[in-house]
Design a protein with these regions (language model features):
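C-terminal boundary/linker of central alpha/beta nucleotide-binding cores
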Residues: 1-38, 43, 47, 92, ...
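Short, well-ordered secondary-structure microsegments
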Residues: 31, 35, 69-134, 141-148
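Short coil/turn connectors between adjacent alpha-helices in alpha-solenoid helical repeat scaffolds
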Residues: 38-41, 63-74, 107-120, 151-164, ...
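Short acidic-capped amphipathic helix/loop micro-motif used as an active-site/signal-coupling element
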Residues: 46-66, 87, 103-106, 126-127
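Residue signature of alpha-solenoid helical repeat architecture, marking inter-repeat boundaries
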Residues: 47, 77, 93, 97, ...
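Tetratricopeptide repeat
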Residues: 83-86, 119, 123-126, 162, ...
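Amphipathic alpha-helical segments of tetratricopeptide repeats
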Residues: 87-88, 127-132, 167-178, 207-218
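Tandem amphipathic alpha-helical repeat scaffolds
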Residues: 100-113, 141-159, 169-171, 181-198, ...
Length: 223
């Protein structure tokens, strides 16, 4: 140590470096924390966005038939980019039930506005989701998505696939005793079978569909 008690010259750079590094690490920690907080807020906003559009889609779905249907279909078309963002968020975060519910409620919109490839892509994804077991979602959610997927497959000429999807939907709806659901899925099954020219089975399925759904099932066959 020098006679005046000051620190040796060769220790000054090391001490200075230590102080600088400590300050940098502190700044990095603070920045990382701020980013985590920001990301948490962004994720929460994205979740709320997806939840909002799930509610919108599910509340709009029953209005997609009848005299006012075109206005509601156009409303969904205007929000299509937001709906796509909600579907992507559900996919990217593994929110299987939200994604399945969105897709299941959107099939009539996709069908009416000709978004067949997009609709089938999303429905196929959620029904065979690699990020989670869709069987863990409520049974009616899967049954509804299967029925919608059957409709879109039939519209694109995939009649055998449509039949398989509709048959699984019927089985699930039967298991939970959902009569309107059974009527709708049987109608989809009958349509797929009729498109394969199996009119005997088609008539049987249509007849059973009417027995479960009454006038509502008959209306579905005319849409």
């Amino acid at each position: 140590m020098p006679p005046d008690g000051s620190a040796p010259a060769d220790t000054i750079p090391r001490a200075t470096t230590y102080v600088i590094c400590s300050s940098m690490y502190k700044m990095i920690r603070e920045f990382a924390h701020e980013q985590l907080v920001t990301n948490d807020k962004s994720q929460e906003i994205a979740r709320q966005h997806a939840t909002y559009f799930l509610t919108l889609v599910e509340e709009t779905e029953p209005k997609l038939t009848g005299s006012a249907q075109q206005g509601w279909l156009n409303h969904l078309e205007a929000e299509h980019d937001n709906i796509r963002a909600a579907l992507r968020w559900a996919r990217d975060t593994g929110a299987v039930e939200i994604g399945l519910r969105l897709a299941g409620a959107l099939w009539r919109f996709w069908e009416s506005h000709g978004h067949f490839p997009e609709g089938r892509k999303w429905l196929d994804y959620w029904l065979t989701c690699p990020m989670g077991d869709t069987n863990g979602a409520p049974m009616w959610t899967r049954a509804k998505a299967l029925s919608g997927a059957a409709r879109l497959a039939d519209r694109q000429g995939a009649y055998m696939q449509s039949e398989e999807l509709a048959a699984e939907s019927v089985a699930l709806y039967r298991a939970i005793g959902d009569h309107p659901g059974i009527a709708h899925a049987l109608n989809a099954l009958a349509t797929a079978v009729a498109d394969q020219h199996d009119y005997v089975r088609a008539e049987a399925w249509f007849t059973e569909s009417w027995s479960y759904g009454g006038n509502s099932a008959i209306a579905m066959t005319r849409q």
